[in-house]
UniProtKB/Swiss-Prot annotation:
EC number: 2.3.1.275
Family to which this protein belongs: Belongs to the PlsY family.
InterPro entries: G3P_acylTferase_PlsY
TM region(s), chain numbering: 2-22, 54-74, 85-105, 120-140, 141-161, 162-182
GO molecular function list: acyl-phosphate glycerol-3-phosphate acyltransferase activity
Quaternary assembly: Probably interacts with PlsX.
Organism: Staphylococcus aureus (strain JH9)
Protein name: Glycerol-3-phosphate acyltransferase
Reaction catalyzed: an acyl phosphate + sn-glycerol 3-phosphate = a 1-acyl-sn-glycero-3-phosphate + phosphate
Protein's membrane topology: Multi-pass membrane protein
Top-tier EC class: transferase
Keywords: Cell membrane, Lipid biosynthesis, Lipid metabolism, Membrane, Phospholipid biosynthesis, Phospholipid metabolism, Transferase, Transmembrane, Transmembrane helix
The protein's annotated pathway: Lipid metabolism; phospholipid metabolism
HAMAP family: PlsY (MF_01043)
């Protein structure tokens, strides 16, 4: 029972819509009505500005990061293969990612999983996250598309999990990559049409 409570708590924390709340609280804006209509960090930068964008990014990363440690902090006990699987920090973090993408608070219309996924990876393997961040910024520097850099970094996480032979990370990163690609399908279409906005600060 406690494992179910832990996973539900992880989902609800992940579902906290940082961009939406900050937009409403400090700017009196519904971020869903501007830019890409997304509640995540990238659209927060576009609509609310850099300070708010950085705050949303931090909060979204933190959501994923903190949930990884729930199995250590909460009184959960694994007494079999199934309970052991669901008390793995990566699996608990996956529920936070699902909450971020499909938040119950906003009729299941949330962000695109990038920052919260980064928080989960930070919690389980900071060195891998550093490598992925370097790849992200290299791709971003070359092509100027946040969406493309995010997808490439996600795919590299799958490859990295194979290299280090972390098979739970492999499963989670593969699922997240699928979600991320699906959530970015409109961005991908705009890239092919030459209509996707490029960043100007790099």
């Amino acid at each position: 029972m406690m494992i179910i409570v832990m996973l539900l708590l992880s989902y609800l924390i992940g579902a906290f819509p940082s961009g939406f709340v900050i937009g409403k609280l400090f700017f009196k804006k519904d971020i869903r009505q501007f830019g890409s209509g997304n509640t995540g960090a990238t659209n927060s930068f576009r609509v609310l500005g850099r300070p708010a964008g950085f705050l949303v990014t931090f909060l979204d990363i933190f959501k994923g990061f903190i949930t990884v440690f729930f199995p250590l902090w909460l009184p959960v006990h694994a007494d079999g293969p199934i309970s052991t699987f669901f008390t793995n920090g990566l699996i608990v973090g996956l529920f936070a990612i699902l909450g971020h993408v499909y938040p119950v608070y906003l009729k299941f219309q949330g962000g695109k999983a990038v920052a919260t996924s980064a928080g989960v990876v930070l919690g389980v393997n900071p060195i891998l996250l550093l490598i992925l961040a370097i790849i992200f910024f290299i791709v971003l520097k070359i092509f100027k598309y946040v969406s493309l850099a995010s997808i490439v970094a996600a795919i590299c996480c799958v490859i990295g999990s194979l290299i280090i032979q972390d098979y739970i990370l492999l499963v989670v990163s593969f699922l997240v990559s699928i979600i991320l690609i699906i959530r970015h399908r409109s961005n991908i279409a705009r890239i092919f049409r030459g209509e996707e906005p490029k960043i100007k600060w790099m």
